[in-house]
Amino acid sequence: MAVNYGSKRVVVGAHYGLRDWLAQRVTAVLMALFTVVLLAQVLLSKGPIGYDKWAGIFSTQWMKFLTFAVIIAMLYHVWVGMRDIWMDYVKPVSIRLSLQVFSIVWLVGCAGWAIQVLWRL
């Protein structure tokens, strides 16, 4: 009895499962840590929280970079979830591809907008 392993094996489907599950967990942890850092800065600051305080928190380059890294992580987190929804629930390939392309364009636009907001371009 011959066993057909290796390069002749037929694999069906995308099989993103474990990688995407891990990616969403890593991005979720990164977003949670960012929330803790942001809350610590807000809670440890003296005086009322106003525009000047918020602008001061996000004025340093390391905070801008950290915020942008978290935004990119969140956009990837969103992409994995939306792609899974489109793949699971939208059966016509043309509609699914259109929705995926629209999602990518929208998320890239959100990243560009985040750059404009953070660095006031």
PLM segments and residue spans:
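Membrane-embedded alpha-helical bundles that constitute the cytochrome b-like, heme-associated redox core
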Residues: 1-121
